[in-house]
Amino acid sequence: PIPITLTLVPIVIGAVLYGPGAGAGLGLLFGVVTAVAGITGYDAGTQGLFVLSPFWTVATCLVKGTACGWAAGMVYRAFRRKNTLACLVAALCAPVVNTGIFALAMMTVMRGALVAFAGGTDVVYYLFIIVIGVNFLVELTINAVLSTAIARIVQVVGKK
């Protein structure tokens, strides 16, 4: 399993407060940190991917982080007149995009690594149940719960 990240929450806050560009920048920073953690061995799962597919591992880290921050900002912008709803949808969007791009990369450009890790288990089952399953649900739940706090931060900052 991949580690659960709480880093998406500050990315969403930045995207909501300062727009999609800021969300993308924070997401890119998250991607860089994730890639470095994998390269250095701090994150064993990412390191395993890096050993088997260095270019695509780094590219996936950078793209998924950047895209989740940008998407959260765009979604918030689309719904911003309804602050609480906008924050909820933006907060849910980030883990969906982050995990979705990871899954897409694993099923396409890093499929060889996925097959190696699955060790004979059906790759779709392995990816979505073993690797992503609980992680995604926890991240989605945390972001949903914290979206009200994000909305409150936006209200307070917006009044200044």
Where are these regions (language model features)?
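Loop-helix junctions at membrane interfaces
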Residues: 1-160
